[in-house]
């Protein structure tokens, strides 16, 4: 009798497990796929340089998508006030981003840069970026650009938010530019080209709006510095900044 009951119990258990296994394929995902978006102006600032120039600067990023797949737009540039020159667009990029790990995404797409004027010769390029959080919560973006002439440029941007209180942060920032090839057309010399170090104190009024003040130092290096010296131009720049970090 016990053997019959045991055999029946085993048969029933196997039947239930088999039915559950077959039905799992029809179960909906416990978390549905949802799509979100964000627009972030990481730097929206007014700069006063050591040679008395007033410069407006923006650095923004917008994205839309899910956890793994996103459409990303990045734009960065500056305008020197009252110098008679057009706005300098440092980049405008449209990218596809894919999350490759918990903290890193790879992005690739196309971009353009140059002076925003009707007769400007814009530089168009393909770009691959690796962006995310490094150990100890350093925010990093590594980008490789290849323009239509085959000229290559590598750019690294690193930031760290040192939290002083619930609403106050001290943010060191480093940007390094390296030209992997010469470019006569765009007046670039190969080698390590420029390094820029900044420090900003940021205070959140609300989470979405955080005014800041800061300082920076920029230095041309290598062949780029030699070319500037030959033209009688300065190879370094220091400035103070006043701006806000805004997102929505």
What name fits each language-model region?
Residues 201-204, 234-248:
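Outer-membrane beta-barrel "beta-signal"
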Residues 119-183:
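Detector for outer-membrane/organellar transmembrane beta-barrel domains
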Residues 19-82, 98:
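Outer-membrane beta-barrel initiation region
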Residues 37, 56-60, 90-94, 124-128, ...:
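Hydrophobic, lipid-facing positions within transmembrane beta-strands of outer-membrane proteins
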Residues 64-66, 98, 132, 146, ...:
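Residue-level signature of outer-membrane beta-barrel architecture
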Residues 43, 73-77, 108-112, 142-146, ...:
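Transmembrane beta-barrel strands of outer-membrane/channel proteins
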Residues 67-73, 102-108, 136-140, 165-170, ...:
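Repeated loop/turn-to-beta-strand initiation elements of outer-membrane beta-barrel proteins
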Residues 47-55, 78-90, 112-124, 144-155, ...:
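Solvent-exposed loop/turn segments connecting transmembrane beta-strands
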């Amino acid at each position: 009798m016990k053997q019959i009951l045991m055999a029946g119990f085993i048969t029933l258990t196997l039947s239930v497990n088999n039915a559950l296994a077959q039905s799992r394929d029809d179960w909906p995902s416990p978390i549905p796929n949802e799509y979100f978006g964000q627009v972030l102006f990481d730097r929206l600032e007014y700069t006063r340089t050591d040679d008395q120039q007033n410069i407006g600067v923006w650095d923004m990023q917008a994205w839309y998508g899910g956890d793994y797949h996103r459409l990303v737009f990045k734009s960065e540039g500056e305008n020197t006030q009252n110098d008679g020159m057009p706005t300098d667009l440092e980049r405008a990029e449209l990218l596809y981003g894919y999350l490759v790990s918990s903290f890193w995404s790879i992005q690739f797409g196309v971009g353009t840069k140059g002076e925003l004027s009707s007769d400007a010769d814009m530089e168009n390029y393909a770009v691959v970026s690796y962006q995310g959080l490094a150990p100890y919560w350093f925010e990093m973006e590594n980008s490789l650009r290849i323009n239509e002439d085959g000229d290559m440029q590598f750019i690294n941007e690193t930031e760290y938010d040192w939290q002083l209180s619930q609403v106050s942060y001290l943010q060191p920032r480093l940007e390094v530019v390296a030209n992997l090839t010469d470019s006569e057309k765009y007046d670039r010399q190969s080698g390590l080209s420029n390094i820029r170090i900044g420090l900003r104190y940021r205070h959140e009024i609300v989470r979405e709006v955080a005014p800041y003040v800061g300082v920076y130092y920029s230095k041309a290096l290598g062949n780029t510095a030699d070319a500037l010296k030959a033209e009688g131009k300065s190879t370094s720049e220091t400035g103070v900044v006043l701006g806000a970090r805004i997102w929505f």
